[in-house]
């Protein structure tokens, strides 16, 4: 298994699919990386030599991926919570942030029902 950005990439899959195992790289970005490095999308990772793998690693390094991306996302949420804006309050209360109804639905975000104590 090859390692890119600290993630084990499966050898037996196509290059585009294998690159999506890295957090922050979807199918579109994987296609762009393959085009920039000159690797055919249908090429298996096991068929690539070390020079091509180094090119792919260099191209992936240009993007924000894995731990840096996770940290950036959590810092953005923390910033909203510190500002005290509406979105930050919704994050703080573990409620839906993007305007969904929460009277009857939103069980995933709110968690299991809590009984009313008498």
Swiss-Prot record:
Q: What does this protein do?
A: Located at the top of the head of the 30S subunit, it contacts several helices of the 16S rRNA. In the 70S ribosome it contacts the 23S rRNA (bridge B1a) and protein L5 of the 50S subunit (bridge B1b), connecting the 2 subunits; these bridges are implicated in subunit movement. Contacts the tRNAs in the A and P-sites.
GO CC term (a single one): small ribosomal subunit
Q: Give the keywords, sorted.
A: Ribonucleoprotein, Ribosomal protein, RNA-binding, rRNA-binding, tRNA-binding
What is the native source organism of this protein?
Answer: Teredinibacter turnerae (strain ATCC 39867 / T7901)
Give the stretches traversing the membrane: none
What HAMAP family does the entry give?
Ribosomal_uS13
Task: State how it assembles.
Answer: Part of the 30S ribosomal subunit. Forms a loose heterodimer with protein S19. Forms two bridges to the 50S subunit in the 70S ribosome.
Look up the domain of life of the source: Bacteria
Q: Which GO terms describe its biological process?
A: translation
GO MF term list = rRNA binding; structural constituent of ribosome; tRNA binding
InterPro entries assigned: Rbsml_uS13_C, Ribosomal_uS13, Ribosomal_uS13-like_H2TH, Ribosomal_uS13_bac-type, Ribosomal_uS13_CS
**Any idea what this protein is called?**
Small ribosomal subunit protein uS13
Family affiliation: Belongs to the universal ribosomal protein uS13 family.
Q: Where is this region: Disordered?
A: 93-118
In the UniProt record, what gene is named as encoding this protein?
rpsM
